[in-house]
Amino acid sequence: MIEYLKGAIVGLTPTNLVIECAGVGYDVNVSLTTYSAYQGKKEGLIWITQLIREDAHLLYGFSTKEERTLFGQLTSVSGVGPTTARLILSSYAPQELAALITTGQADALKAVKGIGLKTAQRIIVDLKGKIQLETSSDEILSARTAVGDAALNTIASGEEAISALKMLGFADPAIRKAVKSILSEDSSLAVEDIIKRALRML
């Protein structure tokens, strides 16, 4: 199994990263958190989870071991597959997600596409005692009220956000309506922030 890949980053979108190692290019599925970590970088090391199926060999990559661990923990929960786990990690940063699970915020988890109330509750029951990430009192307080949005970046790309959301399986009309609404409130949002907000609306 592949532990990590290290090399030149030759392609990067909010959902995928292409990394070249020894002349071979690997297409890696990533979350928004990992996408943000590699923006503007020409080289990097990405931690890998490899899923082997009859019809495909899939790579999921993470900027930290902690995010990879969370991905593995999420996919160990009945009803949570790799696509849903990536959506959860795209909606909430690792520390944010750890705070949600620690404080039992099922409604916040339920806001993610593909997560119903029963699955959200199952995630909390199964993982509450397993989460190892440190969560500060401020993060827990934020989770108990409403999870704070990620820090805003400078320039947003609505079309890139729309394209990424399509790749995640959402319908075009609903995507455009959500993105338009988000940008009408704040046109300076970075693409990952647009997507995070849209994921909570779709």
From Swiss-Prot:
InterPro entries reported for this sequence: DNA_helicase_Holl-junc_RuvA_I, Hlx-hairpin-Hlx_DNA-bd_motif, NA-bd_OB-fold, RuvA, RuvA_2-like, RuvA_C, RuvA_C_sf
Entry protein name: Holliday junction branch migration complex subunit RuvA
Organism encoding this protein: Porphyromonas gingivalis (strain ATCC 33277 / DSM 20709 / CIP 103683 / JCM 12257 / NCTC 11834 / 2561)
Subunit and partners: Homotetramer. Forms an RuvA(8)-RuvB(12)-Holliday junction (HJ) complex. HJ DNA is sandwiched between 2 RuvA tetramers; dsDNA enters through RuvA and exits via RuvB. An RuvB hexamer assembles on each DNA strand where it exits the tetramer. Each RuvB hexamer is contacted by two RuvA subunits (via domain III) on 2 adjacent RuvB subunits; this complex drives branch migration. In the full resolvosome a probable DNA-RuvA(4)-RuvB(12)-RuvC(2) complex forms which resolves the HJ.
GO cellular component annotations of the record: cytoplasm; Holliday junction helicase complex; Holliday junction resolvase complex
One GO term (biological process): DNA repair
Principal subcellular localization: cytoplasm
Region (Domain II), start-end ranges: 64-142
Region annotation (Flexible linker) ranges: 143-153
Localisation: Cytoplasm
GO molecular function per UniProt: ATP binding; four-way junction DNA binding; four-way junction helicase activity
Keywords: Cytoplasm, DNA damage, DNA recombination, DNA repair, DNA-binding
Cited HAMAP family: DNA_HJ_migration_RuvA
Ranges for region Domain III: 153-202
Task performed by this protein: The RuvA-RuvB-RuvC complex processes Holliday junction (HJ) DNA during genetic recombination and DNA repair, while the RuvA-RuvB complex plays an important role in the rescue of blocked DNA replication forks via replication fork reversal (RFR). RuvA specifically binds to HJ cruciform DNA, conferring on it an open structure. The RuvB hexamer acts as an ATP-dependent pump, pulling dsDNA into and through the RuvAB complex. HJ branch migration allows RuvC to scan DNA until it finds its consensus sequence, where it cleaves and resolves the cruciform DNA.
Comment field on protein domains: Has three domains with a flexible linker between the domains II and III and assumes an 'L' shape. Domain III is highly mobile and contacts RuvB.
Residues covered by region (Domain I): 1-63
Record family assignment: Belongs to the RuvA family.
